[in-house]
Amino acid sequence: MIKSAISLKAHAKINLHLEVLGKRSDGFHDIVSVFAPISLADELLMQRKPDKKECKVLSPLAELPAENTITRAYEEFKNFAGISEGISVRILKRIPEGAGLGGGSSDAASVLRGLNDMFSTGLAEEDLRAIALKIGSDVPFFLGNEAAVVRGRGETIKRVSVFSDYFGILIYPEIKSATPRAYSLLGRKESEILNPAFNPELFCGKDCREWPFFNSFEDVLFTEYPAIKKAKQDLLTNGADFALMSGAGSSVFGLFKNEKTVKNAYSKLLAEYGRCFFFLLLAF
């Protein structure tokens, strides 16, 4: 049954761990990372436009470039599945851009799932993953909604259980961190062989205070942008049991086990940081 409209939520992710290994011959980098979806999300309303042949994106609160992940997802899906109708997508952006939260990738994955449902094309998971990887390295992860250890350039995804009974605070320090720039600061050489420091699956189910997790980008980006380092320190000073920068920056997050502590921390941090979000992990 072809549907005329679908409402979608595109959740952000945080990286509980992110280790960048060598640079591959195809120009991408191998990573070992733990991705976890969180409650912060964009909202999308997708509608069929039978008299159109393209995707029109409407965003009342944010200017999106003509070439964006939503239109890219539509074009890739249309070419693969052979649909001929256009769509419109109205998006309410809540996930900051350039923040290491995967907002654009999550939007794209939600559109792929929505198109598969709207037009009843019945594409298999492997087909959706193949389309997703053409759009971006993080997009395949967002086709699911569970924590995962992600390897390679993002194509190897292993679902894992992460103890999710935490309260979270996310700070976006109003710095747009460009992923290519972050990788260039790391200076990984092509075909450089680096072995992972450890297997993150062994620690995902443990208390966050026992995690040995880290983010390879922190040292170089903290030097480049001291405000990111300060935001992380402010989370720890205000009682976070674990704090880390997400992705290639610039957002940082803190996990709290105690509800009273997180409420006090949130009120203090919100007064200092304009873009401060309370969240819950969606990792079970």
Swiss-Prot record:
Please provide the Gene Ontology terms (biological process) for this protein. Answer: isopentenyl diphosphate biosynthetic process, methylerythritol 4-phosphate pathway; terpenoid biosynthetic process
**UniProt GO molecular function:** 4-(cytidine 5'-diphospho)-2-C-methyl-D-erythritol kinase activity; ATP binding
- Domain of life, per the record? Bacteria
The catalytic residues are 13, 138
The catalysed reaction is:
4-CDP-2-C-methyl-D-erythritol + ATP = 4-CDP-2-C-methyl-D-erythritol 2-phosphate + ADP + H(+)
Documented EC number(s): 2.7.1.148
> InterPro entries recorded for this chain?
GHMP_kinase_C_dom, GHMP_kinase_C_sf, GHMP_kinase_N_dom, IspE, Ribosomal_Su5_D2-typ_SF, Ribsml_uS5_D2-typ_fold_subgr
Keyword Nucleotide-binding tagged: yes
Q: In which pathway does it act?
A: Isoprenoid biosynthesis; isopentenyl diphosphate biosynthesis via DXP pathway; isopentenyl diphosphate from 1-deoxy-D-xylulose 5-phosphate: step 3/6
Family indicated by similarity: Belongs to the GHMP kinase family. IspE subfamily.
* Protein name in the entry: 4-diphosphocytidyl-2-C-methyl-D-erythritol kinase
